[in-house]
Amino acid sequence: MGNRKDHYYNKSKQEGYRSRAAYKLQQLDDRFDVLFGGASVVDLGAAPGGWLQVAAERAGARGKVVGVDFQSITQFETDAGLETVRGDMTEDETRQRVRDAANGSADVVVSDMAPDMTGEYDLDHARSVHLARQALETARELLDAGGHFVVKVFDGRDFQDLLADIEDEFAFVATHSPDASRDASSELYVVGKNHIVAPIAEGDEHTVEIVDTGDEGDGIARIEGYTLFVDDAAEGDTVDVTVTDLKPNYGFAERRDGA
């Protein structure tokens, strides 16, 4: 553990990153492609700024990066495209300031927030889940359809419930422990890609009118502007359906009459 810790600590000093945690985001992005040129990124729990540096590098000159932490974040040599907010993300005022700084929406929300450690594992785990849920709520508020999410959480009894809630929000979800994490750490990162913004949920039942036909012959219905593909339905049909799968901009449904 010590050798790996020293490796990333020394590497961060040599390469000018403010923390060894910068390599965690690098490795997560290398594996899952959550950051991209021109992206609008919100970084929660951003102090001292290692993740901000990586996000700014990968978003590039056309990107916008907003970092928030209750601790002060020392100004960067170049702040082009980078803004920091000092405050507590559990407070409504801070959340509003972040929304304002991000101009109301973001392509990516990342969170490396962690609780003050007590040494009591169950308590530390519960607090980390609480922070992760705060980050998820921020992602719900800020992410456009197709947006991405990365959040740190300590493994434990409440993890699966949190994971299930994240899976409800994103088309792709994975967990990963990057090499830059310490060997003895229980931290995991959950990656959610392609945020689903839909007026419906999987399992919902609806009566819909088929208004068009897709390239593969599926019927197309629209619910509050959201596109729903329905098997074995023709334009002009009115059918009862069950929603089976949701993507950021479209979903799929099956007819309930078995046609």
UniProtKB/Swiss-Prot annotation:
GO terms for biological process: RNA methylation. Its main location: cytoplasm. Residues 199-257 form the TRAM domain. Keywords: Cytoplasm, Methyltransferase, rRNA processing, S-adenosyl-L-methionine, Transferase. InterPro entries: NA-bd_OB-fold (IPR012340), RNA_methyltr_RlmE (IPR050082), RNA_MeTrfase_FtsJ_dom (IPR002877), rRNA-MeTfrase_E (IPR015507), SAM-dependent_MTases_sf (IPR029063), TRAM_dom (IPR002792). It comes from the Archaea. It catalyses: uridine(2552) in 23S rRNA + S-adenosyl-L-methionine = 2'-O-methyluridine(2552) in 23S rRNA + S-adenosyl-L-homocysteine + H(+). The active site is at residue 152. Belongs to the class I-like SAM-binding methyltransferase superfamily. RNA methyltransferase RlmE family. Specifically methylates the uridine in position 2552 of 23S rRNA at the 2'-O position of the ribose in the fully assembled 50S ribosomal subunit. This is Ribosomal RNA large subunit methyltransferase E. It comes from Halobacterium salinarum (strain ATCC 700922 / JCM 11081 / NRC-1).
